[in-house]
Amino acid sequence: MYLRRKIDAFLEEWKASNDRKPLIIKGPRQVGKTESILHFARSHYPHILYINFVEEPKFKQILSDGYSEENILRNISILSPEAALIPHETLLVFDEIQEFPDIATSLKFFKLKGNYDVILSGSMLGLNYRRIESNSVGYKEDFEMTSMDFEEFLWAKGYGESLTTDMLSHMQSLTPFSQLEMDQYGALFLDYCLLGGMPEVVKTYIEQGHFSQILPKQRQLLLDYEEDIRKYLPGLEQTKVLSIFRSIPAQLAKENKKFQITKVARGARLSRYMDAIEWLNDAGMVNLCYCLNFPELPLKGNGDRSRFKIYFKDTGLLIASLDEEAQEDLRANQNLGVYKGALYENMIAEALFKAGLPLFYYKKENSSLEEDFFIRSQHELIPLEVKAGNGAAASLRQLIKNPNYGDIHRGIKLVRGNIGCRENIYTFPYFCAFLLKRYIKGLAM
């Protein structure tokens, strides 16, 4: 069972380009990179050469005579004589390149020759990407893949583009959803929250129709991520990174979700842990959301690098990291308890990141003024508040009405309720979060 992904359309466009460059697909482990590449390859190429540098490390020898296309193909033929290497017919796929980043140097020569399409893929690439970038600059194209977003989950459940179009139309016209729509889409979104977006987890749920086999898969994924930390880091750094990674659920369960290093180790200093935090971010395991120095445009350069929140890149990791009682309560009773705010906030951060939006929040010193996220349109800054209930939005009103915040004219509130608008505060259900970038783009037109 293949689950349709957004990378499918990108690969179609890449193949149709007359000036296509070798492609590097990066992203966290188990988000479906290899499956999507091979699904595309089987329907577009008569022959595929697939090399996995983890499963077959012997292929690291293919560069022993240099980086030219001729030498690489000759060495591949020596190691794999049955390989069909036919110009303009064979797709070359090099997987797990984090184990062999030197292969990226060959992309220049493959591009200049133009005989073969080449796709490279790997996880943990942030750790080696400066090296990969310097070795292939100007001769490759990049695509960053994430786990499934809510739209892809809806595709997996059998819905098509017409649903997305209808949802966006409701948002643009501020037309409330019917009760049937609210119940159905809300239930789907809650299922997605509990599952996360890892394809193998979603596939199991789609095939079985229940959650009974989901938790073991989520826990294994969490263990795999921790194993990567142990694999790629020496002892002391490994301990720091694991300590931070394991502290995220407790950090998010706090009323103030700002990352506090003292929750990781008593008496610890943030400066000693920043490399470990950046490692997790580069490895694609977490999203960092920086506090704005002041809520104004431009956003770039306006973030305080010493004040931030850490979210799991995929909310399924947050679910898997909770204690067993909390997990059972979540699935059996849909009781979000103390983690209600954490779950929804992590999910919205994930949705914004997957839509290509940067993550920023704001907390005014010595004040109750605080906003969860910000989105910029062409000419304005729009604060975004995630409400666990459907309560008041005092901070939103203050930001909109106070002339000191001149870039802010309206705000958005995400709630469990329906669509509405009052005092320039636009209210949308949580399940609309994946459409916010498209909605904001429409406001600017």
Where are the predicted features?
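N-terminal pre-Walker A segment at the start of P-loop NTPase domains
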Residues: 1-16
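Conserved lysine of the Walker
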Residues: 33
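Hydrophobic positions on the alpha1 helix immediately C-terminal to the Walker A/P-loop
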Residues: 36, 40
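Short glycine-rich substrate-engagement loop in P-loop NTPases that contacts/grips substrate
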Residues: 55-88
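Structural recognition of the conserved hydrophobic beta-strand(s) that form the central parallel beta-sheet
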Residues: 93, 117-123, 144
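Interdomain motor-coupling "hinge/lid" segment immediately C-terminal to the ATP-binding subdomain
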Residues: 130-253
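Accessory nucleic acid-recognition modules appended to NTPase machines
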Residues: 203-370, 374-378
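Catalytic cores of nucleic-acid endonucleases
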Residues: 388-428
